[in-house]
Amino acid sequence: WNVIALDLPGHGRSEGPALESIEAMASWTIEIIDTLGLNSIALIGHSMGSLITLETASRLSDRVTHAVLIGSISPMPVSEPILDATANKPGAAHSMLTSFGFSKQNLMGGNPNPGMWMVSDSMRRYEDEAQSALDSDMRACNAYQRGLEAASEIAAPTLMLHGDADRLTPLRATKPLLDALSNARMDIIPGSGHSLMVEDPNHVLDQLKIHLL
């Protein structure tokens, strides 16, 4: 596989203003895919990225060979306290999203990756992101209502990965999305919260290999 890890506009090393809707983010993603001339792709997205994956895969049809949705529910409502914090109190927003982004067990410490502290790494990543981009992202997730319709249009084999201790997108809320997908499999990671890729990276990698290879 050749891997392309995208930084959306206004994020990471990508310049420009942040896009304000999941639909716009999907359109931008498709522009990148078209520019690169890719006709056989697997799409993988976490949280907001999973909504972008849904919307993108529904539009690209049979160009998508596989899809992976990590920590995904649809709709994906964002609470008013978080929206208020991302707009007006960035420090509080970083703390809230970090606190709720991990299982209670993993917040206490420990890391399968030696030499790393999950909680501190999460805080640094939020602090490095522009406040306006984080606020725009949260509002885009909250506003996106086409997820189940998009899911029903996806024929590609789809893997849903979810932590059983996810407090941002609770496991109990995954059923509508799972039911809307015609060719889906759910894998539940014990003891993980919303930040699966750092809470249990080996499990996530193993499931990606099973699904994609």
Model-predicted segments: where are they?
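Short beta-strand/loop motif that positions the catalytic acidic residue
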Residues: I154, M160-H162, D166
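Conserved alpha/beta-hydrolase catalytic His-Asp/Glu region
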Residues: D84-E153
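Alpha/beta-hydrolase active-site loop signature
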Residues: L8-G12, S74, G193-L196
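Active-site loop/oxyanion-hole signature of alpha/beta-hydrolase fold enzymes
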Residues: W1-I44, M48, D206
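Flexible "cap/lid" loop of the alpha/beta hydrolase fold
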Residues: L51-L97
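Conserved catalytic-core motifs of eukaryotic protein kinase domains, centered on the activation segment
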Residues: S14-L19, V78-E80, L171-R172
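Catalytic active-site module of serine/aspartate enzymes centered on a nucleophile-bearing elbow/loop
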Residues: A184-L213
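Short alpha-helix in the alpha/beta-hydrolase fold that links the catalytic acid
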Residues: A156, P170-D179
